[in-house]
Structures are given as C-alpha cells and as structure tokens.
C-alpha cells in the first residue's frame, strides 16, 4: 500500500498519519501544493490524503494552485482511487463533488463530541465509537454534494463527515493531530471568541483526547488498508 498526501500549509502536517505509516511499513509521499510542487501520477499511490490549511476551498483567486489541485483530485476520484479529505481537504472534496463551501456562522475550535450515525454503514469508519471527542479547527463549512451520505455531526457543525462511492471519505474534524503540532497551530491562531471556540489553554490540556484521536486515525487508516487489499483481490 502506498499513501500520497497533499499539504497546503506548513503548520498543518500529517502527524499521526505519518506515525501510522511508519509503524505499518507503508510507503508515504507528499506534494506541498502551496509551494508549487508537481502532482504524482495517480498510479503511484493507493490512497490519496488531502490535509487541511488556513485558506478557504473557494479562494482560488488568492491561491490559484487550488485550481490544479482540484483537477488532480477529480482525476483521482474518476479513476476510482481511495481518498481521505481532512478539514480543508473535506471542503475541497465537497467542492469537487458539486457542493457549496462557505464561511460558517461561527468557528469550531477545540475538542467537541462528534456523533457518528449508526444508521449508515461505512466500512471505512468500522470500529469507531458512536460518539467521540475530536479536534476541530475551522471557520468554513459546506453543503452536502448530491450522491454523498452524511456520516457524522456535531453540535457546532452539522456536516462532520461524508462518504462518496464507498471510496471517498471526507472528515471535517482533525483525527491526525499531535500535541506538538497543535501547540504550534494554537500559537499562530491565538484565542478565538465564540460559542464553539475553546481557549488554547483548555484544548491543549486534553491528553486523553489526543490519544483517542490517534486511535480514531489509526482505525480509519487500517480500514482503508483492508479495503484496498480487498479491492486488489477483486481485480
């Protein structure tokens, strides 16, 4: 199995995705899209991961590289690749699939309970608890594109996760966070006021949530690995 991830921001990194890949002996490569690096051939990876970033999925005028990135992602989806989008990555997926991405009425920052729908079966989320505290750091949201299934919600943001064609998973939350990188992000962002914005001093103190988040990330990646293996057998 080979994973390729797209990075948009020096402050937003692969963190526990990289940790899992190292432990599993998985090949991991990346494109720093914001630095103009070239995209790989889609045959070079089995799973494409789209990380977060501080820009908006709709800000193509300010970040023109978004145009080429979206075209690359569309091609990967058309070629039936497995895809995981995180935060901005989820919003880019929503946009690519025809959904509207827009500023939310409030920011959602910190550890908030995310509720996964027990009514919707999704093999890529198999083994996750029905409710779990996950890290949020976003000011935008999206309307669900046609043809996707909503998988999770929170009090502060209804659309927390969706699945498309059983292979494309979008999550608004950040399961890939580490303590060290979250500290850097918190220092850059400062405290934000709002009904769903926790102060950094609060969310940086939640060691148990960081550990549970890592388990969620590892479970999702293991599920992708299993589905990719099954797909290869079916060929």
Where are these regions (language model features)?
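Amide-donor transfer/coupling interface in amidating biosynthetic enzymes
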Residues: 5, 78, 116-235
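Short coil/turn segments
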Residues: 9-10, 106, 155
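N-terminal beta1-alpha1 cap of cysteine-dependent amidohydrolase-like domains
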Residues: 1-81, 194-235
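A short acidic, often aromatic-flanked loop/helix-cap motif at beta-alpha or helix-coil junctions
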Residues: 35-39, 109, 142, 158-159
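Glycine-rich, phosphate-binding/catalytic loops in enzymes
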Residues: 20-23, 64-68, 101-102, 153, ...
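Conserved beta-strand segments of alpha/beta enzyme cores
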Residues: 27-29, 100, 133, 149
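Cysteine-nucleophile active-site neighborhood
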Residues: 50-120
């Amino acid at each position: 199995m080979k994973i390729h991830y797209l990075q948009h921001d020096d402050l937003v990194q692969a963190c526990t995705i990289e940790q899992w890949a190292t432990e599993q002996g998985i090949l991991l490569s990346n494109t720093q899209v914001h630095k103009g690096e070239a995209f790989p051939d889609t045959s070079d990876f089995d799973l494409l991961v789209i990380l977060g970033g501080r820009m908006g999925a709709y800000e193509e005028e300010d970040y023109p590289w978004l145009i080429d990135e979206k075209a690359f992602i569309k091609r990967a989806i058309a070629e039936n690749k497995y895809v995981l989008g995180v935060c901005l990555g989820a919003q880019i997926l929503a946009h690519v699939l025809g959904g509207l991405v827009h500023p939310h009425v409030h920011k959602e920052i910190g550890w908030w309970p995310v509720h996964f729908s027990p009514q919707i079966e999704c093999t890529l989320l198999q083994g996750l608890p029905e409710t779990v505290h996950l890290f949020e750091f976003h000011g935008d949201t999206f309307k669900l594109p046609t043809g996707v299934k909503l998988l999770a919600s929170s009090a502060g943001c209804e659309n927390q996760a969706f699945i498309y064609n059983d292979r494309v998973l979008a999550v608004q939350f950040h399961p890939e966070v580490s303590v060290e990188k979250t500290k850097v992000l918190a220092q850059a962002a400062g405290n934000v006021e709002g009904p769903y914005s926790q102060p950094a001093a609060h969310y940086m103190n939640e060691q148990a949530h960081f550990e549970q988040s890592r388990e969620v990330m590892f479970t999702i990646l293991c599920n992708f690995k299993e589905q990719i293996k099954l797909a290869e057998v079916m060929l």
